[in-house]
Amino acid sequence: MGGVHKTIERQRSSPMTSLLIAIHVLAAVLLMGPVMITVSAYQSQMMKAKDGDAKALGAATTLHRLTSQYGPISAIVLVVGIAIFLTNLSAFGSQGRFHISILLSAVAWILLIAMIIPRQKKTLAALESGSKAVDFAKEKKQLSMFGGIFNLLWIITALLMFL
């Protein structure tokens, strides 16, 4: 057993902590997985849609909808993680990896809300209206960069949980 499990074994955890950990893990799997995929897949569909592919426009629309709906809800992973941390400070408070995980999760979530979702929304609006005002090549690079950073932050966070 690794990470969180070792920490909890050292310290008797309350049923509330166990419940919060279960919610945290389920939320991470059910919410973060889809968001990580959608922020990675949107750009290629956007570029195909720019060239007139109607199916790609539908796919880009669906990917953006998933990102913009699951993304904000995914804050539950961070909120529950903080709740776990605060309900058992004696077990988690002295371990820097949990501090780092909370920080990385917050940065990833802010990146999603402030940079990724607005760019997807802007490019999708341009695709739907046929506007040529958007530099799609530049937006693809930006979305790929921010999506890659977002995914890397979550992967590092997940690894820290199992150290």
Segment roles from a protein language model:
Residues G2-G3:
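Residue-identity detector for glycine
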Residues I8-L163:
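Polytopic transmembrane helical bundles with strong interfacial aromatic enrichment
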